[in-house]
Amino acid sequence: MSSMTDDKLESNYKGNALLHLLSYMKPYAGWVTLCLVLVLALTGFDLYRPTLIGDAIDNFETQGDYNVIINTAWKYGIVLVVSFIFNMAQTWILQKTGQKIILTVRRELYIHIQSLSSRFFDLTPVGKLVTRVTNDVEALNEMYSGILVRLFRNIVKIIGLAVVMIALDRGLALVSFVLLPIVMVLTVVFRIISRKTYRIVRTKLTDINTFLSENISGMRVIQIFGREERKFEEFKDKDYRLYRAHYREMMVFAIFRPLIYILSVLSLMIVLGIGSNEVLDGAISIGTLYIFSQYIQQFFDPIQELAEQFSTLQSSIASAEKIFTILAEEPQVKEDENPIVLPKVLGRIEFDHVWFAYDGEHYVLRDVSFVIEPGEKVAFVGATGAGKSSILNLIGRYYDIQKGHIYIDGVDIRKLSKKLLRSAIGQMQQDVFIFEGDIESNIRLHDDIQFEDVRAAAEYVNASHFIEKLPQKYKEPVTERGATFSAGERQLLSFARTLAHKPAILVMDEATANIDTETEILIQEALEKLMKGRTTIMVAHRLSTIQHADCIMVMHKGKIRERGTHQELLAQNGIYKKLYELQIHHVISS
């Protein structure tokens, strides 16, 4: 089963990422408008300051009055103070608005990921999803917190400077713009190269996050097989590739910025050279030349910033495309428009000529039909890959079938509310997932379950035997995946979690497979009581654990080949008997 690549993810998104990003700003349109007004004012102040000093130079030259300098200083100071206040207000608005939008995007993405079907998670590495929710969402922060507004400010500033310079002296303005075509070419080249380098950085970062997520989770296996050095070499290779990608990105900026600076200095030198002659000829004043010199410096700065900001904007759009691709991903298992909500689930299960393939092509279940009445205990046995666990996945509708029907209490599960269906099924797996928190929260799973019910469930499955011995009992902290508990203790917590939610149907995928003999003895009695009055479906490899089932179904290559009680199947002298004799022989040999 191949994983879903970044290219595949991006190809699924067909919308306009920038327009989609801008749509998140609609709820804050008032604040954004105020921010743009402040930007226009700040741009006006930037244009006014050189004019203020230039006029002061000309007035002092003609009048020789020091009051001109004093008045100019006061005006300049007031402009600086007002600019500071406006800039502070603009920054506060941008940061607050940007963080709220990022909060919205991150929550929307997480909620959507929760709604996706199991098939999506089968194909998508966890590390990539973590990167989307963290790094890629954070990449949008700079865009919302400044890039868009600074882009607007720099564009307005460039236009304003060009208009004012032409108004002051058209000839000198044209001289100032002589190097502009070269700057524009460099800017376009920079944008193209920087976008490519950024995409490479993001890809390498995703690769290393995926590697870390997988290998840290599987560190025990790495240590058991002594693969630390090999894995470190793989990590070094991926880390070096990320370093090289960052280095190339840095070099692009390191070359572009000095080039723009050199061109701005050359332009200034040309203007000062020509402008000085015009001053000597009396064509323009010294103040006008000063204004031009300041405007040229201001003119090239926003051009450089525009190129870098466009690059950052493109980077944000690249991250947004990945995010919106996930948001555009449709759950394969969809809720019915008018789902049926049963007042009470009795637990009757029927498979009617069911065909199922995880990839839609290679069937793992072929024409499977059976009926389980409420309260019956049914076990599925067979070799690995026979389709036993697939049946469990289909009962909870984690996947949809290609052909046939599955009914719960006579209702097609595709018509039932997914929440109601899954809440009626208590699924106990071999690989128990324990969340960080405490024991009580892991049993309750933050549902509306009273502590008395939590404790009663733990006592019922004998989990209280080890919980009561802990220093903080039910408030005992639990580390990630419950690493401080034994496999048997984690299974007991899983049993208690299932019981606390009072399901009508029990599904056990070799639920006692990883439990030691002593712990298994403790829970067998609890399981017998637990299964009374509940439809129970068991998948077992150890046939000794299911001999008392009401019905045993033997699966082989996706089909039910035999069915009956333990004794009936032995009498058939078929697949089940062979499996049973093999296990008996193995036990005797051991």
Please report, for each region that a protein language model flagged, where it lies by residue.
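Short intracellular "coupling" helices and adjacent cytoplasmic loop segments at the cytosolic face
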Residues: 2-9, 62, 99, 107-131, ...
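Transmembrane helices of ABC transporter permease
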Residues: 27, 31-44, 79, 146-200, ...
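Helix-loop-helix
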Residues: 62-65, 71, 164-178, 248-321, ...
